C-alpha cells in the first residue's frame, strides 16, 4: 500500500509539473492530484524539489533500461539505430509527461542531485552516440557524431508527443520513417520506410 501510494504521488507530480511547469506547479496542487492533504504528502516526500528529482531519476532509469533491452535484441547496426528511434518515440507515447520534464526541467534540480541527473542524461546520449558511430561509414570526428546524435534526439523529442503519436503503431511507423530519412538522406533514393519495418519484424 505504501509503495502504491508513493507511485501515485510521483505520477501526480509528473503530470502536474509537465502541465504547469516546475515553477508554476504548487506542492498543494500536487498533493490534491495525489489525493492527499498537504501534511499527508510531506509524510512521504520533503517537497517539490525532491519530487522533481525523483520523477527525473526514475524516468531516466526507465528510458535507459528500455533502450539497453532494445539494443541488446537488435542484430545489426541499422536495427540498433531503429531500436534507438523506436525506444525514444515509444517512451514519448507512453510517458509524454516524463519526457517533457526530462527535456525541459532537468536543470532546475538543485545541488548535487543535478549532477546525478546530468550523468544519466549523458549516459543516454552516449548510447546514442555509440549507435551512430557504429553505423557511420565515413569516419566522422567525435564532434560531428555528437552533433548528429543531438540532432537526432532533438528531432525525436520534437515528434515524440501527441498529436504526432496517437498509438503504438504511430510510434512504429514514425520510427521507420525517421530511420530511413536519417540513414539515407532526404534527397537520396531511399528504401521505403515499410521495408525498415519489415526488416525489424524479420530480425532473428
Go through each PLM region and give its residues:
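Short hydrophobic clusters on alpha-helical segments that form packing/core surfaces
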Residues: 5, 9-17, 88, 156, ...
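Helix-turn-helix
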Residues: 8, 12, 16-50, 54
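Hydrophobic alpha-helical connector segments
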Residues: 54, 68-97, 148-152, 175
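Alpha-helical bundle regulatory/interaction domains
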Residues: 55, 59, 190-191
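Amphipathic alpha-helical packing segments from all-alpha helical-bundle domains
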Residues: 58-68, 91, 111-137, 146-150, ...
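Secondary-structure edge/capping motif, primarily at the C-terminal ends of alpha-helices
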Residues: 67-70, 74, 102-106, 159, ...
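C-terminal peripheral helix-coil segments that are non-catalytic and often amphipathic
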Residues: 90, 126-134, 155, 161-204
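Amphipathic alpha-helical segments used for helix-helix packing
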Residues: 93-112, 161
